[in-house]
């Protein structure tokens, strides 16, 4: 059953239960179903072709969810977007846009302005409404994922893939409410939102870190979902504001980027002891997961391979290698579909290098695009980053390879400092470390690292930034 059908189910079974909580609005399941029904009726009057997907740029999270669900109920595939993605819509075959802020329009196709007339009138008895029986058909969700490149790539998540995902993850009876920190334009935020609503529980969203932590205390939220960088941002705020109560948090689920031991220790000491790492992708969903308690002593460990996932480590020729030996990671899951585009011989290649242990733990040592070859010496950027981030005066680090005028690759490192830092002294300390062995060519102190929606450092943008800094010195 589709998540939209389940919303209508819960609207009948438990109509007054909050479905979506934000700082200025509580939307019950009955209210959400009413909104979906009314918006779906309006969409039917627009004369759109159901074979063409529709993008949405809606600021209010409850309305964004309601409009996306209404489109699916009316038979349309949906592309949740933001202002920065509008220019990428038409080149990717998406000509129709529903938006709520003037100026958020795309060239060509239909630009449809949403307003409150699409919503049902206030009613004192919303549960008495007789909803049309209209099961959701075979519709897709369309995402644009940038990963570490910063360049948006279109990905299509099929109805079948979403159904398989929900059947596997929406049965957690212990979770009552979840603060979804990740945005509603990416698979992580959308999938977790659908999981929570599918199971009749409550999704919580807020626009700022302070408002998020205030919601946790006010509504006794038990679960938090986000990228490591998003959760670290909330950790930093809690360290500054110890008066904000977060005692109700029982679990934090993080996915999308890597995080060092020091960051994990801060999160567990400040927000919640139970932190679960998820190794996942927009294209093929979850492949491995584990509480950090179980993997914290294993270098590069990202989780135990999930029972539904098939993970292989292969060499450059595609031949499987033994456990313990590094190679190219590939995997497939029931949600994975060749329709997604990032496919070779029915496997998904996330672009990571790593190995499997005999206990079924997946360990990641770097990216295939992040192997820096310095005169024949191969260095994993991730190893350098983890090494530098152990230094007390460094909050974040990112390494990349940049070719000099002769075409020889050099190791460049950018750091975000903890307070003030002596760049030359830090560079000397890094150079002297056995893991670097004098290979560092340039060190840059920057206020922040360029990151995508899930917190991954975007290495293409990083290189452009650092090359620009060299050009100005």
How should these model regions be labeled?
Residues 28-30, 132, 140-167:
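Conserved AMP-binding A3 loop
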Residues 8, 16-47, 55-61:
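Conserved AMP-binding/adenylate-forming core of the ANL superfamily
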Residues 163-177, 185-223, 237:
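Conserved AMP-binding/adenylation subdomain of ANL enzymes
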Residues 224, 351-438, 448, 455, ...:
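AMP-binding/adenylate-forming catalytic core of the ANL superfamily
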Residues 1, 116-139, 152, 166:
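Flexible, low-complexity linker/hinge segments
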Residues 222-223, 239-297:
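Gly/Ser/Thr-rich phosphate-binding loop
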Residues 298, 312-331, 358-359, 419-423, ...:
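Conserved beta-loop-beta connector loops within the AMP-binding
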Residues 304-308, 319-348, 361, 377-379:
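Conserved ATP/PPi-binding loop(s) of AMP-dependent carboxylate-activating enzymes
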